Amino acid sequence: VHLTADEKSAVTGLWGKVNVEEVGGEALGRLLVVYPWTQRFFESFGDLSNAGAVMGNAKVKAHGKKVLNAFSDGLKNLDNLKGTFAKLSELHCDKLHVDPENFRLLGNVLMIVLARHFGKEFCPPVQAAFQKVSLGVATALGHKYH
């Protein structure tokens, strides 16, 4: 992913304020509620029967944190996203059989959650920079599929 110096500064500056546990749990929870077919990958997480159950589910929150920690690794390795996410791409492709479109959906949900948490600070230029990173991460995660 190619970011200008300003974009890189905007992304790293805002990301330093992100509570990965809170934002990750909310982003994954929203993905599971808004796109319910994604729940099939999380059947072992227990009750996902309604929005309240999903958003309050401790396993969803914990996995959301794990997802955002991986995203953080990507932010530290923007010049090598493919390498950074190679093992996760292989896992999601070969073992979990996750549709790679779900990575893009999660990225879009993450944008909504960041906007909700950071309001005016998540202005259009910051969103544009995050969107680039998110798409780069989704593409890297989908790499094994090609």
Curated annotation (Swiss-Prot):
Family (UniProt): Belongs to the globin family.
Starting at the broadest rank, the lineage of the source organism is:
Eukaryota, Metazoa, Chordata, Craniata, Vertebrata
**Sites bearing Phosphoserine, chain numbering:** 44
Q: Give all N-acetylvaline modified positions.
A: 1
One Pfam family for this entry, by name?
Globin
The gene for this chain is HBB
Could you give one GO CC term from the UniProt record? blood microparticle
Question: What parts of the sequence cross the membrane?
Answer: none
Question: What SUPFAM superfamilies does this protein map onto?
Answer: Globin-like
Q: What is this protein called?
A: Hemoglobin subunit beta
Residue positions, PTM Phosphothreonine: 12
For the modification S-nitrosocysteine, the affected residues are: 93
Q: Give the GO molecular function terms.
A: haptoglobin binding; heme binding; hemoglobin alpha binding; metal ion binding; organic acid binding; oxygen binding; oxygen carrier activity; peroxidase activity
In the UniProt record, does the keyword Iron occur?
yes
